[in-house]
Every structure is written in structure tokens, then in C-alpha cells.
Amino acid sequence: MKKILMTLAAVLCCWVTTTVFTACGDKDDETIEPPVQTRTLSAAEVCYLVHMPYNGRNICNYIVSYKEADGQEKSGMLADTAWVKRITVSDFPFTATINMNVQRNEAELTDSAYNFRVYYSVYSVTSIFSDGTRVETYRDATPTYIGLTCPARTAEAYIAERFPERLKAKSIELSTDGKVLYFQTR
């Protein structure tokens, strides 16, 4: 009787083991792919920047021209030492352009010397995707800089002759996927 019970226990143990381990198996040959997120570019934020920190701005009018999101050229006289303009573009390709113009105003030359410094740039581009993600795709590490310190007696000539030859337009072109295709100073 002991032999029959031992045989029955062994068969029962094998049957339970087979049933349990077969039920817990998984399929290692199938790989589960994570869902692919498709995000598309919905817009880009372009940031223009102008900085003119010195006293040359007291005797000059600084006029900035830039391209708006709708492609129209806008311009205006700057009243402060720093100017930042952000536009959101949704039509691609788009060429962002900034240009400076300096004109002598009616103010008297009261200082003994003048510092003319202007930094201007298409400073940064941030791509905005359909899922709300924002990625900075471009930052201008070297804004256009023009400047000179001159005595008051030569300030008039410098404004009339030197500024026009040094002021160049800066442009960048954004492709249909929001990438910066080229950067140009002309």
C-alpha cells in the first residue's frame, strides 16, 4: 500500500508541476513595440534682439526693421537701450530678417566723446510641436556688433559715413520642419 501511495503522490506531483509551469509561461519570441508618437511642427517662435547700451543713442535715432510672422516688413524707432520682439510663425518655410538703421537726430553734442555700440540679432528660434513640446533649435552665439568710441567733433562724420557701411541685415531661414537651413549676414 505504501508503494501505491508513493507512486500516486509522484504522479500527482508531476501533474501539478506540469500544469502550474505551463500556465505561467510567456512568449519570448514576440516583441511588443511601444507606440510611436508622431509629433509634427505646429509653429516656431522667433526672437529678435537689439541692445544699444551707450551714450551714442542720445544723439541718434536707432531704427529697427524686421519681418513679422505674416511676412510683412515692420520698422520702428527704438526708445530704450534694449528691444526684444517675439513672433510666432506657422507658415513654413519662413525667413526671419532683422536690420538696423542709424540716423542723426536734432540733439546737441554735449559730451566730449560718444560710444556707439549696437548689438542686434535674430537671437533664437524655438520649435513648437503638436504635442506642446518646445525645443530651442537655434541660438545666435555671436550677434552682429558694431561700435566705436569717438570724440564729439568726429561723431557727425562717423554717423554719416561709417554706420551705413557696417550695418548689415541678418537672416535665417526655417524649413518646413522648423530647422534652421542657413544663417546669413548681408
Named regions from a protein language model:
Residues 97-186:
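Extracytoplasmic electrostatic interaction patches
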Residues 65-105:
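Tryptophan-paired
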Residues 1-23:
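Sec-dependent bacterial lipoprotein signal peptides
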Residues 58-61, 69-84, 129-139:
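Surface-exposed loop/edge segments in extracytoplasmic proteins
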Residues 34-65:
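Short, surface-exposed binding/anchoring microloops in extracellular/periplasmic proteins
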Residues 54-73, 109-121:
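Surface-exposed flexible segments
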Residues 15-46:
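Bacterial Sec-dependent N-terminal signal peptides
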Residues 48, 85, 124-127:
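Polar/charged side chains located within well-ordered beta-strands of beta-rich proteins
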